């Protein structure tokens, strides 16, 4: 079994758990603060267990929930966010997914991000960025959407620097609440913007998927856009200050 095949099977099992069996009481239960700094819920830990089962043969797993699951011999690191946007999931808001980054010598060479709400799955490796659905694994190349009307501004509700200035540009945006998943859609939307503390669980896979786009990643600001004009307009809001 290849790494991609294992990752797909893990996502399919998790999707089956969510959409067929459904959430139960313990899935909503909060547990301890996870390795990523957020409180893990029961469904976070269930999802992690599924990914560890499928991916542990390939290398050491670094999970946002429980931290490190060591591999005895492999130098490969696999960075996972078992549920990206778990607050959305627990609030029954259909925008949540999973993120997997396969790291060789500190560099991401293979990434899988899945939207568990609608089944979209994005995979990037040496063959480029491709997209399919979990139910129909017919992968097609991802190209830039030239008709996008909105961008994504994750965590806009707690923006300290950009939000007041962004309104002056007249750009439409949404703040759906799953950063890694939003990065997977960066070729579709006008831009993806984030202000705040960034963790490797959030950006490792998405940054690799966006490396062909215009990108700014420094301190607490992350901006990516397929449109150079929009990228320049937004980046000047914080580069010049």
Question: For each predicted feature, which ranges?
Answer:
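N-terminal subdomain of lithium-sensitive/metallo-dependent phosphomonoesterases centered on the IMPase/IPPase/PAP
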Residues: 1-80
């Amino acid at each position: 079994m290849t790494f991609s095949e294992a990752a797909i099977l893990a996502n399919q099992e998790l999707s089956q758990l969510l959409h067929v069996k459904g959430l139960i009481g313990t899935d909503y239960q909060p547990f301890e603060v996870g390795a990523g700094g957020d409180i893990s819920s029961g469904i976070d830990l269930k999802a992690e267990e599924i990914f560890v089962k499928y991916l542990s043969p390939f290398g050491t797993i670094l999970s946002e929930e429980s931290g490190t699951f060591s591999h005895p011999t492999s130098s490969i690191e696999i960075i996972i966010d078992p549920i990206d946007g778990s607050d959305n999931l627990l609030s029954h808001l259909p925008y949540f997914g999973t993120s997997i980054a396969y790291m060789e010598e500190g560099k991401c060479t293979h990434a899988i991000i899945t939207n568990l709400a609608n089944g979209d799955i994005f995979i990037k490796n040496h063959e480029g960025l491709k997209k399919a659905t979990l139910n129909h694994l017919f992968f097609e190349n991802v190209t830039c959407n030239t008709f996008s009307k909105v961008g994504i501004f994750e965590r806009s509700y707690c923006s300290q620097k950009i939000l007041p200035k962004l309104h002056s540009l007249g750009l439409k945006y949404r703040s759906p609440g799953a950063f890694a998943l939003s990065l997977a859609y960066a070729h579709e939307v006008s831009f993806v913007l984030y202000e705040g503390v960034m963790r490797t669980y959030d950006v490792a896979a998405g940054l690799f998927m966006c490396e062909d786009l215009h990108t700014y990643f420094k301190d607490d600001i992350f901006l990516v856009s397929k449109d150079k004009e929009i990228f320049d307009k937004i980046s000047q809001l914080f580069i010049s200050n």
